Amino acid sequence: KSGSQLGRGEPVADTARVLNRMAYGVVWRTFGQGRVEEMAKYSTHPVVNALTDDFHPCQILADFQTIAEHRGGVDNLKNQTIAYLGDAANNMANSYLLGGAVAGMDVRVAGPYGYLPRPDIVADAKRIAAETGGSILVTTDAKEAVKDADCVFTDTWVSMGEEAEYAIRSKPFWDYQVNTELMALAKPDALFQHCLPAYRGKEVTAEVIDGPQSVVWDEAENRLHAQKALLTWLTGKARGDESLLA
């Protein structure tokens, strides 16, 4: 439960107006995407979505930084083929679709029927990809998604707050487990990433997460560096400090 006045029901707009007088920005992890957007609407300073049910952009920054480190720099993100497997309706899948499209990547998302991304998010991703030279594929075929991919991603099959439903919710996802057989379909130098924490033996096997293609520990470290860079840039923007925007 929130320790702020939001926890007792204060309107988001009122909280935003108070924080405008106290801070250069807001970093908020919450459930409803609309709440973050309302905070941004009434804030005079930057608002960072630290995670919602719909999106997890801060994680994507770290993930793409990790790819850049292993692929020779940010300029080489364009036209990388990335594949996400599992719950393709969750915030990570949505974020890979939109973030990958912005970066000009070829994005493939695979999940079972009933767990595919919303049509409006797919449409937005395709529109952006058409402008950046990327591409979007949504499929129920894990092998199709992973074929010749440069990087394979997955996430837990059960999101925060749904742990009690694990046995039921996990049933549709076993065909999307990232294992050595599936990784063999990707490029020989393909990377494996997981935003962590992972359920070993569920969405990913120990052989993969501990194997030579796994860069999950680099990815975890980059959550620190990517967010430091984001806050530095946003703080400089809020203060009008051009030296922090370079």
Enumerate the language-model features and the residues they cover.
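Glycine-rich phosphate/diphosphate-binding loop of Rossmann-like nucleotide-binding domains
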Residues: E69-T154
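Short, conserved loop/helix-junction motifs that constitute active-site signature segments
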Residues: N76-L77, A101, E181-D189, G211
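Short, well-ordered alpha-helix to beta-strand connector turns
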Residues: A23, S43, D148-A149, P212
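Phosphate/diphosphate ligand-binding glycine-rich loop within oxidoreductases
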Residues: K1-A68, R200
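Rossmann-like adenosine-cofactor binding region
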Residues: K126-E207
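Adenosine-phosphate binding glycine-rich loop
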Residues: D189-A190, C195-A246
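Hydrophobic/aromatic ligand-binding patch that stacks against planar heteroaromatic rings
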Residues: V18, M39, G99, L182, ...
